[in-house]
Amino acid sequence: MSLVYLMATNLLFMLIVLFTLSHRQLRKVAGYVALIAPIVTSTYFIMKIPDVIRNKFIAVRLPWMPSIDINLDLRLDGLSLMFGLIISLIGVGVFFYATQYLSHSTDNLPRFFIYLLLFMFSMIGIVIANNTILMYVFWELTSISSFLLISYWYNNGESQLGAIQSFMITVFGGLALLTGFIILYIITGTNTITDILNQRNAISRHPLFIPMILMLLLGAFTKSAQFPFHIWLPKAMAAPTPVSAYLHSATMVKAGIFLLFRFTPLLGLSNVYIYTVTFVGLITMLFGSLTALRQYDLKGILAYSTISQLGMIMTMVGLGGGYAQHTSDELSKFYILVLFAGLFHLMNHAVFKCALFMGVGIIDHESGTRDIRLLNGMRKVFPKMHIVMLLAALSMAGVPFLNGFLSKEMFLDSLTKANELDQYGFVLTFVIISIGVIASILTFTYALYMIKETFWGNYNIEKFKRKQIHEPWLFSLPAVILMLLIPVIFFVPNVFGNFVILPATRSVSGIGAEVDAFVPHISQWHGVNLPLILSIVVIIIGLILALVVNWKEVTHQIIKSASITDGYRKIYREFELYSARGIRALMNNKLNYYIMITLFIFVAIVVYGYLTVGFPHVHQLHISSFGPLEVILSVVTLIIGISLIFIRQRLTMVVLNGMIGFAVTLYFIAMKAPDLALTQLVVETITTILFIVSFSRLPNIPRVKANLKKETFKIIVSLVMALTVVSLIFVAQQADGMPSIAKFYEDAYELTGGKNIVNAILGDFRALDTMFEGLVLIIAGLGIYTLLNYKDRRGQDERE
């Protein structure tokens, strides 16, 4: 149950932070209260490392909807532990960083940290979920919390657009993911992930296997910003920098990669998956690195560099996916190398990219700009950030003695050995190596170019609006700690490899500790080999391009992503246009139209049921006895109902409508139901009086002549509805297997204290229902009151 307590603890801290909204002084400490949550979470995951290394996994299952195998099923294994450590440890740094970044006087700190806690809660939920539907719930919660965080500064138009764009794309991917999970349930009859993976061979032979893969890939590609779904990530940079450092570099964008790692033993059985993931990753890596060179905004550069690095990791996920169909120890060694490298670089990327984002946030916060055309010579005012960002950028570029070099060399090693696989021949291997090397060169180029344009050169304070620029120590502390980790990981990589990455590799492989024989030992020196030569080539060419070429003059010649973004905007505008037309057609403020739509849907559902199940055989028909009074009432009601269709005087219509109600009252009397008759009489009288009184408040709308076609259609709808209700009565009469409720009538007085069965039912069963109905009316009344008292934001006095 420890996983349940962990999730409950995070929810508890959300409630505590929510409580700080109640007092102005408490709001200032909301961030420090929220900081306790990632500290507790990271402590929990660190304490579980020894158990996971010994393959002692934690599993919890609480029934939710067991009939369809939807349960609160949580599991902590090596993969979820690694991601949990990244989420929580990076979270500690980001939460503390945010307390220094946000204003304690103007920003709503509790609201921000509630959103951030909700996101961390959702991400942890994704990585420990062992049920596909539960994973989907957490998956969409990350999209919702991301939307709230991106739009935190909601008065900023860019924040609004970025939030909507990211939400639209990631939710679209989430729906595709849900479709894939439903297909898996259709094939296997279970939503439990471990059970699904145990049936992988049977699933791979099913005709829905490929459609399921494509749906899961859509979910992963949209979440992890893969081409062409990458366009939401640069727009999301409108969020506060702590959000960018946490969600859009270290955690949320890794959710899609986590999904593919989790299902690798199943998805890797298809070559469609292997080719698609590998080449989408390579294209994304190349496109992201090339587009980063045409950015002037530091966060824009980091956004596209994140896209590129995610593409690099995705490439390794695709190449290593073939392990699911391996046939020899040599191939197993290669596949495990690639998967291990992907996990290793994922960890390295979280460290150096988060440090870069924090550095950019400090520069922006203190200088008031992120434009590299203005940020020259900043090493003089930001000496600590100069060192932090230089080391982090060089690590991203793959320079020796930094952690990024190790995983980058493993990546190049994976590319050079691709020709050993059945899926790749010489030509494809050459293409893969070429794209990987070119993208790596461009990565080195924009990394060093960013540092050169920001920190080197001549410092001119006149370019900045703020003349007092300084570098607060507490503000810089999280970035400095992350920077120190970069060389530490390089010199003691196997500490992280054995305690974090090895257990994760076991989980990804699907065979547990048996994979240990193939897991590589991370070495800083492998001798002179092809990957080392390629690394040297990348560094030399990257240095030349970064230091010699004036990218400010040639960026307009580089490919632009505007066409894809413009395509999204065009689709979104068309979507809004057609949505507006549809809403105007559907919501036309005509009550009778709404009623007809409701009745039509009801009839359609009933007819669909008859077509699917079939109309039951009529073996018994109960018709109540009736006399002259019932006949007269029926005829009168029919005549009045037909008259209402053609009469246009409002007062006459209300009176006739009331007469129908009073006729129903007489029906109840004839059927010997005096309580119902009295209730109907009171309700009908009050309703009729209120209707007439309300005329004094209604506008004087001119009378409209009856349209014969429309009125005929109304008559048809009414007749069809009447036939539907009668048919349902026939169906109800044929049911003879229902349990008797006569016993309740006998005990009604003793149990409820009511002498009348109707009163007993209303008092015993409808009390709670009536209470909530009253609550709904109160909420509706508050909404109406708000609308009536709403003033136009432009300062006009007229009410909406």
UniProtKB/Swiss-Prot annotation:
Q: How does it assemble?
A: May form a heterooligomeric complex that consists of seven subunits: mnhA2, mnhB2, mnhC2, mnhD2, mnhE2, mnhF2 and mnhG2.
Organism name:
Staphylococcus epidermidis (strain ATCC 12228 / FDA PCI 1200)
What Gene Ontology terms describe what this protein does at the molecular function level? antiporter activity
Q: For this UniProt entry, which segments traverse the membrane?
A: 1-21, 29-49, 78-98, 109-129, 133-153, 167-187, 209-229, 241-261, 272-292, 300-320, 336-356, 387-407, 424-444, 472-492, 528-548, 595-615, 627-647, 651-671, 676-696, 712-732, 768-788
| Family annotation (InterPro entries) | CPA3_Na-H_Antiporter_A, MrpA_C/MbhD, MrpA_C/MbhE, ND/Mrp_TM, Proton_antipo_N
**Is Lyase included in the keywords of this UniProt record?**
no
> What NCBIfam families does its record include?
PRK12646.1 (NF009286)
Please give, as recorded in its UniProt entry, the membrane topology of this protein.
Answer: Multi-pass membrane protein
Q: Which family does it belong to?
A: Belongs to the CPA3 antiporters (TC 2.A.63) subunit A family.
Q: What is this protein called?
A: Putative antiporter subunit mnhA2
Q: Name one Pfam family in it.
A: Proton_antipo_N
Record keywords, A-Z: Antiport, Cell membrane, Ion transport, Membrane, Transmembrane, Transmembrane helix, Transport
- Which GO BP terms sit in this record? monoatomic ion transport
Q: List localization entries.
A: Cell membrane
What do the Gene Ontology cellular component annotations say? plasma membrane
